[in-house]
């Protein structure tokens, strides 16, 4: 999953920078999450598991309402968008992925890229590991 050693290796390769710590994953209210910490910031990966399409779409749309949406389509999963703070939300089957980049510097990675691009790279990496993504 998003916090497993395989995901950590893939995300490190994608961003070109190794985290100083990946927190122990938590599972609360059907949300699996962990934080990737770096010397100059961090991001949180979380996946909410839902029971059906209606619940999944409502949860996904709730993020859009709370976090806002930058213009432009994102071709990931069954729907995706970049929030106004550069975080990324992806809906796939009955799961919603949030890559919360709000605690990263505006430019992050090696080579440095806009934090929203870093979030998109992480989301694409995670989606490539999900069966049928």
Where are these regions (language model features)?
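A short, solvent-exposed beta-edge/loop patch
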Residues: 69-133
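Soluble, non-membrane globular domain cores that form compact, hydrophobic packing
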Residues: 2-18, 60-61, 113-117, 121-133
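Short, solvent-exposed recognition patches
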Residues: 14, 18-84, 92-93
